[in-house]
Amino acid sequence: MKTQRQQLILKLIASTPIATQDQLARELRRRGLRVTQATVSRDIKELGLIKVPAGENLYRYAAPPGQRLINPYGRLQRLFADSVTKIDDSENLILIRTLPGTAHAVASCLDSLDWPEVIGTVAGDDTILVIVKPKEAVATVLQRFRELGEG
């Protein structure tokens, strides 16, 4: 959800002059997303959006020069294929083993996907603990991980 919302924000600011957070929130709501001003503010910060001149005494949001549309799922697919060595589970916990030094990057991508069943991740150097709620959703999350690993 978060990833799709942020991608939509990047598309909106590229195609429509948006000057305020309130205006951006209205545009997102018009497209069926339920957002608050606080959510929009966090998205703007995470995306690193800047204000650029848009005429005399007018400014609009823009992506920093050289920024592409984000695709954490694609990045996660590459990281999974290159880094994950083993996946195991018990109850509502999934343990992911990775090559040394890559667990934080994989966990960060997992967090950015905003899967509702994943309530959190904890990463060490080569191990990630994924906490799933409810525990019945573990099979679904494991299937997603398998699909990621297959690329």
From Swiss-Prot:
Where does the protein end up? Cytoplasm
Q: Which UniProt keywords apply?
A: Amino-acid biosynthesis, Arginine biosynthesis, Cytoplasm, DNA-binding, Repressor, Transcription, Transcription regulation
Does the entry feature the keyword DNA-binding, yes or no?
A: yes
UniProt xrefs under Gene3D superfamilies = 3.30.1360.40, Winged helix-like DNA-binding domain superfamily/Winged helix DNA-binding domain
**Which InterPro entries has this protein been placed in?**
Arg_repress, Arg_repress_C, Arg_repress_C_sf, Arg_repress_DNA-bd, WH-like_DNA-bd_sf, WH_DNA-bd_sf
Q: Name one GO cellular component term.
A: cytoplasm
Which Pfam family is an annotated match for this chain, by its short name? Arg_repressor_C
Main site of residence?
cytoplasm
GO molecular function per UniProt: arginine binding; DNA binding; DNA-binding transcription factor activity
GO biological process: one example: protein complex oligomerization
Pathway(s) where this gene product acts? Amino-acid biosynthesis; L-arginine biosynthesis [regulation]
**Known role:** Regulates arginine biosynthesis genes.
Q: Which family does it belong to?
A: Belongs to the ArgR family.
Spell out the protein name for this chain: Arginine repressor
Q: Which organism is it from?
A: Moorella thermoacetica (strain ATCC 39073 / JCM 9320)
